[in-house]
Amino acid sequence: KPWEWGDPLELNVPETLKKAMAKGLERLSHEDLVIDLAEYTASMSTVVLLDCSHSMILYGEDRFTPAKRVALALAHLIRTQYPGDRVRFVLFHDTAEEIPLAKLPLVQVGPYHTNTKAGLELARTLLKKMGGEMKQIILITDGKPSALTLPSGEIYKNAWGLDPLILAETLKEATLARREGIPIHTFMLAREPELLAFVKKL
């Protein structure tokens, strides 16, 4: 159902995303959020993963600014309506890093690849520290994973197609999250069939 003030924030991401794509992310408001009905209210810990790789501004299309607005809107919603809940933010690019909410509006896209695995791994680590009865990851991205941190610490990159190694390691990280009871809700800003198929596996 549509979200109303006071409802627990159990986002139905696919339905919310349909509204966002129809209106444009830059015009997304709380009225466009769709939630799943919950039988009880429990404390929720959320990590928002924001893709700041170069593809977010490729071909003259700025997808990063609207993506930041979505992240900031979620932060405002959680902090004002659910003071008992916790939310933290992670930027992922060649690697991944936590960023304070106050610095989020200033973040810019860089000449980076997309290390989705590193983002998911850091999100899992943060959620373990945050506690809470329920946990979730909200992933905002526009493209395929194209980077991977190897055991040696070296960053392996491949921007061409879906690299089998990068894909396998990213999906492995998503599987670990699910085993820990952490759903991954993805705002996918691209429409290519192979990328949509990848997201369905997360």
Language model features with spans:
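Ordered, soluble secondary-structure elements with a strong preference for glycine-centered loop motifs
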Residues: 7, 11, 57-65, 113-114, ...
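Negatively charged sequence features
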Residues: 1-47, 54-55
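Short, flexible, glycine/charge-rich loop motifs used to bind or transfer phosphoryl groups or to couple energy/partner
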Residues: 35-39, 127-128, 174
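Short acidic, glycine/proline-rich loop/turn micro-motifs
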Residues: 57-61, 101-105, 149-155
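Von Willebrand factor
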Residues: 17, 39-101, 104-140, 145-147, ...
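VWA/integrin I-like adhesion module and closely mimicked acidic/polar interface patches used
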Residues: 111-113, 143-201
